[in-house]
Amino acid sequence: SLFNPGMEQPPLDLPFESGIVWSYTSGPHAAWGAVEVRAALDFAPPADAPGCLPNSTWITAAASGLVVRSDNGTVVVDMDGDGNEETGWNIVYLHVGTTHRIKLGTWVEKGDRIGHPSCEGGISTGTHLHIVRKYNGEWIPADGPLAFKLSGWTAKAASVPYQGWLISGDKIVKSNRYSSTPAHISRGD
């Protein structure tokens, strides 16, 4: 079995700075390329217009760890710090722009700035962040026994990919690719 009984996801924060309103643009969907595991969530920064435009809003580390990949729009943070993406928990950040992207080998603390959202590193119709968890090299479904939890918000999948919710107590944020108000979310810390 991939997981030990009673195992829980380590605490993770929403991947942006406190007080900045982002949009939850895609609920659980494919982690990487054609991979069928619905492990990824998408967040878009505040923007004046849609599309692939430069954005100065910061993506922050959801967890502390070692940057084991930083290229082609991708940053991977290895939470156990052993330098191996195939062991323990790893957080994958996709569409991280080249400008100000954190350097390979850097140790980050939760909340540290790691770069800016972009359209780099894969197919994208608009500037956003695609975030995914891996455990022992396997993509972890965003909705399931180890649901994706960020700053107390838990991901819930709809019946079709890209749709879903983030739920925290009685608060619900519904994914929306057009960044409408019901999709707005911010860190309250």
Which residues does each predicted region cover?
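Short glycine/threonine/proline-enriched tight-turn/helix- or strand-capping micro-motif at secondary-structure
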Residues: 4-6, 22-61
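A structural signal for short beta-strand/turn segments enriched in small hydrophobics and glycine
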Residues: 24, 59-61, 65-67, 105-117
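Active-site loop architecture of trypsin-fold serine endopeptidases
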Residues: 117-129
